Amino acid sequence: MSSKPPSNTPKFSYARALASSQSNKSNSTKASENNTATAEKQAVKPSGVEPTNTSRANAQKKTESTGKITSEADTEKYNSSKSPVNKEGSVEKKSSEKSSTNNKPWRGDNTSKPSANSSAERTSSQHQKPETSSQIGKDNAAPVENVNEKSTSQETAPPVSTVPIQFGSITRNAAIPSKPKVSGNMQNKSGVSSYSSKSQSVNSSVTSNPPHTEEPVAAKPEASSTATKGPRPTTSASNTNTSPANGAPTNKPSTDINTTDPATQTTQVSASNSPALSGSSTPSNTSSRSNRQNHGNFSEKRHYDRYGNSHPSYNKYSHYQHGFNYNNSGNNRNESGHPRFRNSRRNYNNQGAYPTYMSNGRSANQSPRNNPQNVNNGSTPIQIPVSLQTPYGQVYGQPQYIVDPNMVQYGPILQPGYVPQYYPVYHQTPYTQNFPNMSRSGSQVSDQVVESPNSSTLSPRNGFAPIVKQQKKSSALKIVNPVTHTEVVVPQKNASSPNPSETNSRAETPTAAPPQISEEEASQRKDAIKLAIQQRIQEKAEAEAKRKAEEKARLEAEENAKREAEEQAKREAEEKAKREAEEKAKREAEEKAKREAEENAKREAEEKAKREAEEKAKREAEEKAKREAEEKAKREAEEKAKREAEEKAKREAEEKAKREAEENAKREAEEKAKREAEENAKREAEEKVKRETEENAKRKAEEEGKREADKNPEIKSSAPLASSEANVDTSKQTNATEPEVVDKTKVEKLKASEGKSTSSLSSPSHSTSSKRDLLSGLESLSLKTNPKSEQCLESLLNSQFITDFSALVYPSTIKPPSTEEALKAGKYEYDVPFLLQFQSVYTDKPMKGWDERMKETVASAFSDKSSRGMYSSSRQSSRSGSNTHSHAGPGFGGPSERKGISRLGIDRGFSSSGAGFGSGSNYKSAPSRGVSHHGHGGMSGSHRGSQRGSRRGGGERDKPDPSSLTIPVDQVAPLQLSANRWQPKKLTEKPAETKGEDEEALLPPEVVQRKVKGSLNKMTLEKFDKISDQILEIAMQSRKENDGRTLKQVIQLTFEKATDEPNFSNMYARFARKMMDSIDDSIRDEGVLDKNNQPVRGGLLFRKYLLSRCQEDFERGWKANLPSGKAGEAEIMSDEYYVAAAIKRRGLGLVRFIGELFKLSMLSEKIMHECIKRLLGNVTDPEEEEIESLCRLLMTVGVNIDATEKGHAAMDVYVLRMETITKIPNLPSRIKFMLMDVMDSRKNGWAVKNEVEKGPKTIAEIHEEAERKKALAESQRPSSGRMHGRDMNRGDSRMGGRGSNPPFSSSDWSNNKDGYARLGQGIRGLKSGTQGSHGPTSLSSMLKGGSVSRTPSRQNSALRREQSVRAPPSNVAVTSANSFELLEEHDHDNDGGQKDSNSKTSS
């Protein structure tokens, strides 16, 4: 795992690298010389030990100290090892054979020989005297060449301390490396990192160790050789060899031993490179030259053959990174003893530049267990030169790519404190048992360029131990030393070694063998080493305990301080957070309050401004309306005053004229009555005298006339006329001058004329007859004519007879009549042009009521004329009756009457066509006189003949006309006006006095009630706008009210009308919407306030009134128990039934009215859902009224609710509940089918089946609907008029005698217009006077030679009857026998033929 290097890393430079290399060479040379001199001066001699054995004792002590330091990690490695070590000998043998090929050892081999004595001594001196250890390190730093020379001069190679190392399934012993100590005061002046140089020096001392996990073994060779036979001890006293490197006693001084003995030098180097337990920092640097030599002497091929792909670069991306070594010595620690981490590019340990080998197939060795695990000791990772680093991301075995030298290259690093997984960490206890050296030649150890960890010299720092495998605990008996209380390990014999000869031969060099040490010296040396080791161990344990106690106390203090600081910081943070939260909440509350206050103020200001604007606009509107109303009222008042003045004047004039007329009439009536009374008295006296005189004169005249008539008949006729014409002028003058004595002079003139006529006429009979005629005419005229007519007649009586008409002279303006044409057959007739000349002069009617008489005469003439073409007329009846009588005997009372009437269908045809025979006529006809006068049949006589006979033959006179008995117009008195007579209110009621000149009077509630109710009754879709405007004008009266009384009254009347007429709910809902939109905002109710305590105004007030009324009635509900079946027949006619029916009608009307209001957006959808939920609340035992109201409401608003998404989901729920209701067992069928109709209507898109549900229609819509129905009926009419083989027009005796005509339908009149038109043509044809028989049309058509077929309609039969009447057959002999018998026989034959034809058609 790598981390990104710091950004301030200096860029690579070849010049700087060259200067650094040269500086390292010079520094290494100087450091070697200084270290040699310092080591000779400051050699430490342990007390109580012989001079010859000083170096050995020191070395042993150092070795024991080093073993103590590394014993914990090594023991853990040994215990964790699970692989056997029986192949150790073979591995070592193999290694020795490979290394024996080199006659000359590698330059760096001597640095890898372990020396525990120098390490232990160095460690001990570091604990006791830090300044001394620095000097000792200088003394021990000897050149490598010196060490090699000394080692070759010895005869016998000393045994080397080994440690078992496991390579997968192979275990071998590896020598414990050591390296001479170099000066720690050397400064890094070359620009190469001190960490890199330190790690290089350490790695150079352990190049013989392979990069695998090291395993500790027993101290003695015997233990290692017998390891396969029994379990290994879990703890050991020491891991180092106690004998010198050459294995023989030496009498050289300690300084020589320190400087020349390779084992001592390597031990000292190892001790110097081991981490200080006391936390002190001792810088230790090696030269760059030795590093370059170590890199140059790396045996690449031998390393590859021995370890395979176990190099860290081969497992570059593994989680278990290896090949790194951390050096905690030198300047890597600060003043407090803690590791110092440097953020420099040179501080990163990059992989060495390995050659690109191809894979050899040994992939099994690449597992994490076969790779060495480095202990993270907390120091900064080690970095090698950039020129030797492998490019980051380069895979082993692949060709290298060229890297820019100016590019910063970094390798993967291990963070401090990193402990890999899967391998637990265990601590070892030190052991003191010495082991004989198993020396090997320096040539047998392979060099490595990559620094590997030195397990013998490096110890974990900050409590970290090497990662080793856990070994099985040994069950061998332990031997404890009573003095040191440590375990004693029995040393093994050299003969027990697997191959001692090979082991010794490994250490052999081309030089002479070293001298052998006697047993006494060996035992002495061993005792000395033991004492030194025990002392050192004790001191080390005390120091370690003290250090641990101090460290623990320090750590505890730091932890306590840190914990207190954290707690304090936490409390402060909590308090701060709490305080901030409180401040924030307070601030937010203040801001919210402030914002709300601002919003309220703003809202109030806006509302105030809006209210002011509304009030201002309202005031302006009111003022404007007031001005307009004032102007209008003023104009109306002026017009009204003017009109009233005119009416008053007119009325006064009429009254005055009427009074005057009444007075005049009264006066004239009085005078007339008085005059009539006088005249009556006088007339009675004169009449009495007149009667006597007339009787006498009459007798005489009759006698004379009779005689004269016998003599000259011409004089009889001409004399009266001549005398009358001669007396015309004199009668006029007399009438003009003496109008009052007309009756008195009448008799005198009559007598005078009589005398004249007697003297002038030669024949007395002629004069007598003429007198008699004149008197009789006078008598009749005086009784029936008015006074003016009587005057004319009197003048006629006074006129003279004209004897010669040609002698008469007429005025120039008058054209005389034609005398030649006038004198014919003894008569004189005036032509019409001559008489028309006097039209303008003679304007008097002949008698009273002349116009009425003439109207009656003309009307009777027209009625007689029109009745000629009708079957109901008396003239036609008499005419047809006479004809029928001649054929069929007297009337229809004969034996064939039943057959004729039943077969002809006269009872049906005549009654339907308006004939006089039937009583059930469908059409009104002219009054028939003939039938009423002449009784049954009406055919025995002629009404016209009887009427003429009565008039001409002096029959019974008609009763006198009632109009002639009434008093004249002049004598009619006006009606007296009663006091309590009816008069229009406009005339009777005086205009109400206004409160002021500008104010109009308010209509009282009863007037509003009457006017609004009348307007609502007259409201239709065509008059909707006009009538609604009138009602709105009345409702606007509430502007002058504070409680909206008039508006409430209008709403109440509208609501009652809408609920009482459910079919017109749509129209009344539209009217309510118009009122809400058009109502004035000035209308208010001070008793109804809104949420701001302001009176509700305008349309909102109207909506509130209306909805409150709807809600009140809807919540109260309705329930009407209507009677059903026979049990309720008595109740149907009762008053309670009608009341209940009205309640039910209004309840359903209310529901529909509410739905119509919702459709016009006056009610919200939420209110509709609440209503539906209320009606669907009970699904177990619902009321009939609720279900019926629900169905009516859903049929009204269902389509609107179902159109929205939310409403559709709610409607699904409603339908489910309705289905639940339909499944109730005892539910009435009416309610069930009603619910099913609603559900079916929803499935069909809310289609409405009932026409009533669709609402009112205009007249145009009704006409269009009628036309559509007519077209549909015509399209559905059958092409043939036959019905089951029988005539639809004719009756049949076998079908009840009434005929088989189908009943009339609603479209008969429209469908039969053409038939009635043809019937009218037939009637007009009858006026021509043609006569025909009443026989059947089939007979007539048959007689004419046509086919006997039944017609499909009555109109066609009437047309045939008309044709038969017009053209009677001439070739058929009419006999006195009944012609209907022939029809009967023909019908029997035709019925059979028709049946045969029907059977053929059906087959």
UniProtKB/Swiss-Prot annotation:
Subcellular location: Cytoplasm, Perinuclear region
Chain positions found as Phosphothreonine: T884
Region annotated Disordered, chain positions: 1-381, 439-464, 488-774, 861-1003, 1266-1403
Keywords, alphabetical: Cytoplasm, Initiation factor, Phosphoprotein, Protein biosynthesis, RNA-binding
Transmembrane region(s): none
UniProt biased composition (Basic and acidic residues): 298-308, 537-714, 741-754, 986-995, 1284-1295, 1383-1403
Cross-referenced SMART domains: MIF4G
Ranges where the MIF4G domain occurs: 1009-1245
Residues annotated with Phosphotyrosine modification: Y923
Pfam annotation, one family: eIF_4G1
Record's protein name: Eukaryotic translation initiation factor 4 gamma
Positions of modified residues (Phosphoserine): S83, S452, S455, S456, S459, S866, S882, S886, S911, S919, S921, S1333
Residue stretches of biased makeup (Low complexity): 190-208, 231-248, 270-291, 325-334, 757-768, 868-886
Protein role: Component of the protein complex eIF4F, which is involved in the recognition of the mRNA cap, ATP-dependent unwinding of 5'-terminal secondary structure and recruitment of mRNA to the ribosome.
Polar residues composition-biased segments: 1-11, 19-39, 50-60, 109-137, 249-269, 346-381, 439-460, 493-508, 720-737, 1302-1313, 1328-1341, 1348-1358
InterPro entries membership: ARM-type_fold, eIF4G1_eIF4E-bd, eIF4G_eIF4E-bd_sf, MIF4G-like_typ-3
Gene Ontology terms describing biological process: cytoplasmic translational initiation; ribosomal large subunit biogenesis; translational initiation
Family, similarity comment: Belongs to the eukaryotic initiation factor 4G family.
Molecular function as annotated in GO: mRNA binding; structural molecule activity; translation initiation factor activity
SUPFAM superfamilies registered for this protein in UniProt: ARM repeat, Eukaryotic initiation factor 4f subunit eIF4g, eIF4e-binding domain
GO cellular component: cytoplasm; cytoplasmic stress granule; cytosol; eukaryotic translation initiation factor 4F complex; nucleus; perinuclear region of cytoplasm
